[in-house]
């Protein structure tokens, strides 16, 4: 583990504190295609922050496009804007902005189409522009040209988590610890069994999952163990990163460029899959102003770096952070010899 935190930018959002009277407490982050950060402030709701102009705007006066607090914000791949899910109610909304004002483009109320859909657990968009909506009751797909949702069949495996690979293919981990490739073609949601996860114990579940650019599947279990598969997703190895999590709670797992990011409430681990170097960024570091990382306040920067937010704003870990550690070479030094 190397410690070199020179490439950290801090965004304490003083405009937000001045407007509300208390520190920023960010629960969600999402950087859109226009370099505008979508921010969900705890107990307040959706805001916008233009990084290039240091310009902040809230959405409190916009009754038509104000979802209140949200639980999910993900960038739209095919269309402009972001997909969001409000904290209360089973709705999915696509939103854009014009002159730092939020605009509602699409609004899908799941309760009008599905009986007892339950809360929305995740949103993932595939390479065809299909939005996969993972709820407590099942799996649904919103096609890019149709607001009528498609529902997975009753014999569809029960999923515990979804992710997408670099090509935009959708993968699902089932509650019985199997790996599936999912697809939606011609109004049909299908699944293909690709492997099993035998390394998990009986009561151990998959909490977080991602796929790196090599095609290897990474997962964090409910016991805090970290596993990585081979490219065929058939065999798994326990990564020696578990002890770096310590007593932290894992918030997310992301793959981007050469890195896999493991985000916890107290630290961020950046693992370079080619150099096999791991960087550690902790809230206790002097150049990180955020006290604690929160919920889903995680967003890629499209250049191999990461934005992570929480109490007192958010930080930007720039893409060159691991490269500086690459120059450090270590060789063993004998300190003791014991003869028996």
For each feature predicted by the language model, list its residue ranges:
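Beta-propeller domains
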Residues: 167, 173, 177, 207, ...
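Loop/turn residues immediately N-terminal
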Residues: 1, 42-46, 88-92, 136-140, ...
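Acidic, proline/glycine-rich low-complexity intrinsically disordered segments
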Residues: 4-16, 23-27, 34-44, 50-54, ...
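Short loop/turn segments that connect beta-strands within beta-propeller blades
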Residues: 3-7, 50-54, 96-100, 143-147, ...
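Conserved beta-propeller blade signature
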Residues: 36-38, 81-84, 130-132, 169-172, ...
């Amino acid at each position: 583990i190397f410690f070199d935190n020179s490439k950290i930018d801090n965004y304490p959002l003083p405009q937000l504190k001045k407007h509300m009277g208390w520190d920023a407490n960010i629960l969600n982050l999402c950087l859109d295609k226009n370099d505008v950060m979508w921010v969900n402030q705890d107990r307040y709701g959706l805001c916008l922050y233009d990084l290039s102009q240091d310009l902040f705007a809230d959405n409190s006066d916009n009754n038509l496009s104000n979802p209140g607090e949200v639980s999910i914000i993900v960038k739209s791949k095919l269309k402009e804007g972001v997909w969001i899910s409000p904290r209360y109610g089973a709705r999915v909304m696509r939103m854009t902005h014009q002159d730092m004002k939020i605009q509602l483009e699409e609004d899908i109320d799941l309760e009008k189409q599905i009986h007892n859909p339950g809360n929305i657990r995740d949103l993932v968009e595939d390479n065809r522009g299909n939005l996969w909506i993972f709820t407590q009751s099942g799996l649904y797909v919103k096609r890019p040209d149709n607001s009528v949702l498609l529902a997975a069949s009753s014999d569809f495996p029960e999923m515990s988590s979804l992710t997408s690979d670099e090509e935009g293919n959708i993968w699902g981990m089932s509650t019985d610890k199997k790996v599936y490739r999912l697809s939606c073609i011609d109004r049909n949601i299908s699944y293909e069994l690709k492997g099993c996860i035998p390394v998990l114990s009986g009561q151990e579940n998959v909490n977080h999952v991602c796929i790196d650019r090599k095609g290897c599947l990474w997962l964090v279990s409910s016991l805090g163990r970290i596993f990585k598969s081979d490219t065929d997703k058939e065999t798994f190895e326990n990564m020696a990163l578990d002890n770096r999590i310590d007593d932290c709670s894992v918030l997310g797992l992301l793959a981007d460029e050469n890195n896999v990011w493991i985000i916890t409430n107290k630290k961020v681990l950046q693992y370079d899959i080619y150099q096999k170097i791991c960087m550690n960024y902790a809230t206790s570091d002097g150049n990180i102003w955020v006290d604690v990382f929160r919920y889903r306040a995680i967003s890629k920067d499209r250049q191999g770096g990461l934005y992570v937010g929480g109490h007192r704003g958010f930080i930007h870990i720039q893409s060159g952070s691991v490269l500086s550690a690459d120059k450090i070479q270590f060789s063993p030094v004998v300190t003791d010899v014991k003869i028996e």
